Structures are given as structure tokens and as C-alpha cells.
UniProtKB/Swiss-Prot annotation:
UniProt keyword Acyltransferase present: no
Gene3D superfamilies noted in UniProt: Glutaredoxin
Family designation: Belongs to the glutaredoxin family. YDR286C subfamily.
UniProt name for this protein: Glutaredoxin-like protein YDR286C homolog
Domain of life: Eukaryota
Amino acid sequence: MLTKILNNFKSINIRFFTRPGCSLCQSAKEIIYPAVEEDFPTNRFTIEEIDIDKENNKQYFDKFKNDVPVGMIDQKIIFKHRIDEDKLYYDLETILRQQIKKEKEEKE
């Protein structure tokens, strides 16, 4: 039953705001990508990496220029500046459980 639910629900998008030359951003990448790709079920989370320095991302530059790296799911910030790896795992597990519960309830 759980496998069927996991195979049928949509991906959860993590927006990862970053910029070139940011050492904290590089450290965050070394934590978040393995967490999502190796430690959670395949394709349950996707990472949308957003370079705030690009011309078309000016609204993010204005908002996060002094705060990168920033990770968000929906409107919730799950990390800013430095990643607490334990908190990241806790947040991702909590969000995944909530999504599974929601999808299961919608199917019933």
C-alpha cells in the first residue's frame, strides 16, 4: 500500500537560492543534493537551483542578496545561511509524511 502511494504522488519542489562564488552555498550543495538524491525515495523531492545574480532573477536578488543560501518549500524557508543537517532531514521527513497523508486522504 505505501509503495503504491509513494509511486503516485507528485514531487515536492525545493527552491534553492544561491549565487556563484558563495562558499556557504557550496557547503549547502554538498549537504542538500546527497540528502535528496540518496536518502529519500526516488523522485520525491526535486531541487530547483536559482542563481539570484542572473538578470531574470532580480526579485530574488532583492529579497535574498544577504541571505544565500536559502532553501524553500512552498513559502516555508527550510534553511538560510547555513544548513543544520539534522533539521533539514527532520523538515524533509515531516513534509514527505504530510504529503503522503494528504495524497492518501485524497484517494479515499
